[in-house]
Amino acid sequence: MAKKAMVERDRKRKKLVEKYAAKREALKEQFAAATSQSERLELHRKLQQLPRNSAPNRVRNRCWVTGRPRGYYRDFGLCRNVLREMAHQGLLPGVVKSSW
């Protein structure tokens, strides 16, 4: 089980990403369309002034049950340990133990 502070920090980051997503995307589009160097520098400065935690790459994928950041399966939102246990208990529809 991950520390509660780490899980909460990640939740806070997700909220910030959602809050600033539109603004960040608009600045990036303007930056790509900018022609002069001074305009690009100004847009880059504005982009840098956004909160650091509002960048999507600062968010870590975590298991929604345990908060574990490693061994994460995107399809389920679970870490490998919980995925295995839930699959054995039949709690994940369509997941069967492989056999060949």
From Swiss-Prot:
Belongs to the universal ribosomal protein uS14 family. InterPro entries: Ribosomal_uS14, Ribosomal_uS14_bac/plastid, Ribosomal_uS14_CS. HAMAP family: Ribosomal_uS14_1 (MF_00537). One of its GO terms (molecular function) is structural constituent of ribosome. Gene3D superfamilies: 1.10.287.1480. Keywords: Ribonucleoprotein, Ribosomal protein, RNA-binding, rRNA-binding. Binds 16S rRNA, required for the assembly of 30S particles and may also be responsible for determining the conformation of the 16S rRNA at the A site. The keyword rRNA-binding applies. Part of the 30S ribosomal subunit. Contacts proteins S3 and S10. GO terms for cellular component: cytoplasm; small ribosomal subunit. One of its GO terms (biological process) is translation. Signal peptide: none annotated. This is Small ribosomal subunit protein uS14.
